[in-house]
Amino acid sequence: MLRENMRYFLSAIMPVCEEYGVNMCVHPDDPPFQVLGLPRIVTNEADIAWFLNAVDNPHNGLTFCAGSLSAGEHNDTRELAKKFAKRTHFVHLRSTAAMPGGNFIESSHLTGRGHLIDSSASLRKKIRDCLCV
């Protein structure tokens, strides 16, 4: 149901986004796993691909939040940055470190699972062309 509602919403707003040149972007779930039984919609590569293909429009994009994505040990931010750079409309550079039990903490930009140097290299052209980072 959550995905159907998201597709409906995106389908409804994309004509307006096209008309006014507005890029919409989804922020990955933070954290990228269930908490208290709440559903998640964008937690991994498959979810991002579904989201971008649900309404395949260049105005429908991704907020590349390295922190949210790196909080899930199943995600490799370096690969995600390469794969989804063209549809990334906003970049949020933060990093995390894994803790026992699936927990995580914020980490410095040069350490942690965010791999910010490598991820930034893949997103470089997009970052340079973007008004907001």
Regions of interest found by a model, annotated:
Residues 1-7:
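Active-site-proximal, glycine-rich beta->alpha crossover segments in alpha/beta enzymes
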Residues 11-19, 23, 33-133:
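Histidine-acidic metal/acid-base catalytic patches
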Residues 30:
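Helix-loop segments that flank and shape redox-cofactor active sites
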